[in-house]
Amino acid sequence: MRVAVDVMGGDNAPHVEVEGAVAAAREFGVPVTLVGDAEKVRAELARYDCKGLDIEVWHASEVVGMHDSASDAVRKKKDSSIRIAFELVKGGEAVAVVSAGNSGATMAAGMFVLKRMKGIDRAAIAQLFPTVSGKTLVLDVGGNVDCKPIHLVQFAVMGEVYARFVMGVDNPKVGLLSNGEEASKGNELTRETSALLREKPINYIGYVEGRDIFNGSVDVVVCDGFVGNVALKLSEGLAEAVGKMLKAEIKSSFLSQIGYLLSRKAFNNFKKTVDYAEYGGAPLLGINGVGMICHGGSNPKAIKNAIRFAHEYALKGVNGRMAEKLNESFPGDAREREGAPAPDAGTERVAS
């Protein structure tokens, strides 16, 4: 089961992607196909000892830039590395795609080439957040800035399956992000969504607040892509700021430096917990295949872990489990009764 890696999309492509892919092949035994400018890719590969590693190179003559329109990039740049990577999955040459490129283009390419799963109107980008007791899955974190209640319900069902079969959580708790836990809080979108969620075969616990993402009280947090992207960028900025504050305090006095030396292991464990590279990337849920969207500034460690997670996702057959849960949650014409638009209606607006 090969993983196709878009090696031309990230801020430091193709160096970071190739190094991460080589590490994934060496440490985890994952077969990888590097998609991009073959000459540049092979030049990067020559820097490593790849003997015995299952690594292939697939040429793609075009690159989707970070400022390219997602829809135009997919339709006009037919030989781009990101589109070719998804075409490999469609053709059975790979089981998953990993990309640190334009997130909107990655999402658009996944939906354009592999199409949405039956029963899904909008694909969603999910992200694991560290908590005091483990991890919380938040979706959507940028795929759809405008959502209808039915979209959030679909996100909840997909998130529940991901938590159960990827995170290993038995009967995961699903919450809807709001400005308070009381039923009277929220807006029209959250109130309508909450009513629908109570009818679904999932462990829906009601409204949750932003702080609940990190306190371990909920396993899956559902929101629209606008709110989710703000939460994601806020957490990234906070983690970076806290790190800088700690460094400044440690350097402020001799006693602080002694204290740091005595607590170095604890500091290193904390740093590892909040390091996005440990999580690799954000899975794109709702397409007929596996897609992993990485941060544009990902380092080799992040790419390596994204490849591992994408490979494990495919091995566990999560999409098949998701299809079963969707059929259970939306039997017959339930989607029409709940006001779902036709699957291809509307255009997703992506937060970067």
Swiss-Prot record:
State the superkingdom.
Bacteria
The entry's localization annotation reads: Cytoplasm
| Regions of compositional bias (Basic and acidic residues) in chain numbering | 328-339
| Reactions that this protein is recorded to catalyse | a fatty acyl-[ACP] + phosphate = an acyl phosphate + holo-[ACP]
InterPro entries found in the cross-reference section: FA_synthesis, Phospholipid_synth_PlsX-like
- Annotated GO CC locations: cytoplasm
PANTHER family xrefs: FATTY ACID/PHOSPHOLIPID SYNTHESIS PROTEIN PLSX, PHOSPHATE ACYLTRANSFERASE
Role, per record: Catalyzes the reversible formation of acyl-phosphate (acyl-PO(4)) from acyl-[acyl-carrier-protein] (acyl-ACP). This enzyme utilizes acyl-ACP as fatty acyl donor, but not acyl-CoA.
Protein name per the record: Phosphate acyltransferase
**Which species is the source of this protein?**
Citrifermentans bemidjiense (strain ATCC BAA-1014 / DSM 16622 / JCM 12645 / Bem) (Geobacter bemidjiensis)
The uppermost taxa in this organism's lineage are: Bacteria, Pseudomonadati, Thermodesulfobacteriota, Desulfuromonadia, Geobacterales
